[in-house]
Amino acid sequence: FPYTTLFRSQRVQGAIISAKKFPRDSNQAFARIMEACKRPSFAAVATFSYPRGNETVSGPSIRLAEVLVQNFGNMIAGVQELESQDGATIFRSYCWDLETNFTDEKIFRVPHTIRLKGGSMKPLTDPRDIYELVANMGARRKRGCILAVVPKDVSDAAVAKCRETLKRGTGEPIGDRIRNMVTLFNELGVNQEMVETRLGHKIDLTTADELVDLHGIYNAIRAKEAKRGDFFAFPEDEPSAAPEAQSPKAKNLTDLLKQKSAVKA
């Protein structure tokens, strides 16, 4: 679409000129990010947890990555669909620092399938299911690009501030916070006994630090970045690999299209 391409080109050129004319103040950008991380409602969705070996690791959620871009300034990040056919979608995720001209991009092929118990793959036919799968995978890749461009000390500080905000809470008694957390897990099919087994003690002994960790686990399961079986005793949920291990290896578009041509031939 020539008009769309022209519009995007003009928009990018305008953004580059603006970035050169109004460079970011790193101190102000950092302060804005820290201020956002002080909001309890945001902190509650800003991190997620995933299993890595025998450990549980926390990281920035997709929402936190988006806030980093918004507040760090003079950056463009997004996802662009390149091709969708033969039961798969090829798309590009990217993040570009307009001031330094540093960019990170990934081109991925996402098959329209889901993995069932036992390892078999089920093709998706419902357009809504396909859209949700592609959108979710695209958002994850965009997050990866953002975190590759935003300085790591900034993203680490944001995660730490969000954890601090969650730990402090809003003045609500910790007993009420524990009950609310149990209710959230119940909605995912995780009962109180399962949570207690993971914690290694009765639910009423849960500490503020453990509540923060449970928030990350809840966010990961809810966003389908992890399975219940990764953290709790769910025989029907096969444990999944960490997000990095689940991601297919990035390839350039030329290689992907060559692969497709070879298959057709």
PLM-predicted stretches and their roles:
Residues 8-12, 94, 101-179:
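Glycine-rich and polybasic anion-binding loops at the starts of cofactor/ligand-binding domains
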Residues 17-18, 24, 31-34:
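TRNA-recognition modules of translation machinery and tRNA-sensing kinases, especially anticodon-binding
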Residues 257-265:
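Intrinsically disordered, compositionally biased tail regions
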